[in-house]
Amino acid sequence: LALCSILTCLVFVLMSSCVSHGSAGLDPTAEDKLLKAPVAPGYSFAFSTPRSQWQAGTMPHIYQIDPAWSELPYAGGTIRQNACGPTCLTMVYIYKTGHTDMTPVDMCALSEAGNYAPTGATEWSFMTSGAWQLGLNGTELHIDRSSITQALRSGAPIIASVRPGTFTNVGHYIVLWGIDGADQVGVYDPNSQSRSARRWGVVEVLNEIEAMWAYY
């Protein structure tokens, strides 16, 4: 009788364990729905514009924090940590050419092959010399309101290197594209969906910039 009681208790414990572990996870359908859901501002990951929607003349949102590649290696760290520059050039490349052959992974490979990130940070020369390898003409601009507004009004996208401040604690690259009559510009931040979702004043952005290049 005692043995039967012990066995009964063991079966109950095992059944309870299975139930508790199962309820803590997601079934495949629920998990799939979660991964396809919009990412809330402030999260540490974001999903890029699907490759099927990449086309010339439309600026895609491409994120270095996209789970598709964020943890792959680049410049002694990961794409998530170090690849804001290559990710920005990926966006501009897609916008200018409409080609779908270059993701941030491919752009990082191009950067490393040319030794453009020897210390973990992508060098400014990648925005001109590296871009030239892709058939893009990156022209460095003076850091003033006239230069930025003229380039954007002509339809040219801009890659900007920004100092620690609003967009970063260390150093960062962002894409600027589009400007309205109130001098509000579109920011395509490869590290933040929330910062990419709003418009920014020209002066507000200009105060953060260390260098910038337009792609005509």
Residue locations for each model-derived region?
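Active-site-adjacent structural segments surrounding the nucleophilic cysteine of cysteine proteases
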Residues: 1-116, 164
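Conserved active-site-adjacent core of cysteine acyl-enzyme catalytic domains
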Residues: 19-29, 94, 99-216
